[in-house]
Amino acid sequence: MTVTKDTVIGDLLDRNADTAQFFFAIGMHCLGCPASRGETIEEACAVHGTDADALVAAINDFLKKY
């Protein structure tokens, strides 16, 4: 799986729950909330003041190990 800024967080977590650590690191601790699971990575980054491109790159680097 390749992650983009348009990837829905819930879909990503369903495929690899270990990616939750990246969202916790940006202060997104409500991953079980239906609203957050429906957000894209870009939307979550906008709310949490984080660079979406950097987060996507970090997640993709992590996923390459699988």
Please provide the spans of the model-predicted regions.
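Domain-level signature for proteins that mediate thiol-based redox and metal-cofactor handling
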Residues: M1-Y66
